[in-house]
């Protein structure tokens, strides 16, 4: 057995107090996101862990890139027929997690997910590089394949067929929006007495703010 107990550090970079937070979580998310962007040196600051409940009843988590966020929710794109897409179709309750170690911060978002309008998916797909567009068409995401060579051959054939043509979004690929119902902000603090502030959406769409024990 490898002992990992010596991996530890003290978190001392910031604090999270009720006296300096906004009334809604999206405003605070925007503030933290801009701060991690400005911090520099962090690749793909929009990387998040998306956790869903699979058809087998087990949770599954994977890293996905956040592409937009608004006061309505958080948007990412994927293959609707993938394992992730099938899980979402069966159970729309999912969780998003962000961890920005350099700032000693974590955000956990729980909510319900639904597909965005097709024209929005079309617009984002059009903005992607051609290679990414073709990759979305070629890959039957999450399906078992015999070899990587099969994918590369399919991609080459599709590239040849699409020369000089518009590459349209496949109908089984598009965006989801996660409508938050609960958002927790975690700020590392000394002696493991971390700050945890939770925003919880009430039945009348009012955000209740609570402090949680670390």
UniProtKB/Swiss-Prot annotation:
Entry cofactors: FMN
The enzyme's E.C. designation: 1.4.3.5
Record keywords, A-Z: Flavoprotein, FMN, Oxidoreductase, Pyridoxine biosynthesis
Alphabetical list of PROSITE patterns matching this protein: PYRIDOX_OXIDASE (PS01064)
Residue ranges of coiled coil: none
GO molecular function terms listed in the Swiss-Prot or TrEMBL record: FMN binding; pyridoxamine phosphate oxidase activity
Cofactor binding annotation: Binds 1 FMN per subunit.
Record-listed substrate binding positions: 8-11, 67, 124, 128, 132, 192-194
Gene3D superfamilies assigned: Electron Transport, Fmn-binding Protein, Chain A (2.30.110.10)
Catalytic activity: pyridoxamine 5'-phosphate + O2 + H2O = pyridoxal 5'-phosphate + H2O2 + NH4(+); pyridoxine 5'-phosphate + O2 = pyridoxal 5'-phosphate + H2O2
Positions bound to FMN: 62-67, 77-78, 84, 106, 141-142, 186, 196
Pathway(s) it belongs to: Cofactor metabolism; pyridoxal 5'-phosphate salvage; pyridoxal 5'-phosphate from pyridoxamine 5'-phosphate: step 1/1; Cofactor metabolism; pyridoxal 5'-phosphate salvage; pyridoxal 5'-phosphate from pyridoxine 5'-phosphate: step 1/1
Disulfide bonds: none
Gene Ontology biological-process entries: pyridoxine biosynthetic process
Superkingdom in the source lineage: Bacteria
Enzyme class: oxidoreductase
One Pfam family cited in the UniProt record for this chain: PNPOx_N
Subunit structure: Homodimer.
Family: Belongs to the pyridoxamine 5'-phosphate oxidase family.
PANTHER family linked: PYRIDOXINE-5'-PHOSPHATE OXIDASE, PYRIDOXINE-5-PHOSPHATE OXIDASE
Known role: Catalyzes the oxidation of either pyridoxine 5'-phosphate (PNP) or pyridoxamine 5'-phosphate (PMP) into pyridoxal 5'-phosphate (PLP).
Name of the protein: Pyridoxine/pyridoxamine 5'-phosphate oxidase
Lineage start: Bacteria, Pseudomonadati, Bacteroidota, Flavobacteriia, Flavobacteriales
């Amino acid at each position: 057995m490898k002992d990992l107990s010596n991996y530890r550090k003290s978190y001392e970079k910031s604090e999270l107090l009720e006296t300096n937070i906004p009334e809604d979580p999206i405003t605070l998310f925007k503030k933290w996101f801009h701060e991690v962007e400005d911090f520099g040196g962090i690749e793909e600051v929009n990387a998040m862990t998306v956790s869903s409940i699979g058809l087998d009843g087990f949770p599954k988590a994977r890293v996905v890139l956040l592409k937009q966020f608004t006061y309505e929710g958080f948007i990412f794109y994927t293959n609707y027929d993938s394992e992730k897409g099938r899980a979402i179709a069966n159970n729309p309750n999912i969780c998003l997690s962000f961890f920005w170690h350099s700032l000693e911060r974590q955000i956990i978002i729980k909510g319900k997910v639904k597909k965005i309008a097709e024209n929005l998916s079309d617009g984002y797909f059009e903005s992607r590089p051609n290679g990414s567009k073709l990759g979305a068409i070629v890959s039957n995401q999450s399906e078992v394949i015999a070899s990587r060579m099969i994918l590369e051959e399919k991609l080459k054939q599709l590239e040849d067929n699409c020369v000089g043509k518009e590459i349209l979004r496949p109908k089984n690929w598009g965006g989801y929006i996660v409508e938050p119902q609960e958002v927790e902000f975690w700020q590392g603090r000394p002696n493991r007495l971390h700050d945890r502030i939770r925003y919880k959406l009430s039945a009348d769409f009012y955000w209740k703010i609570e402090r949680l024990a670390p």
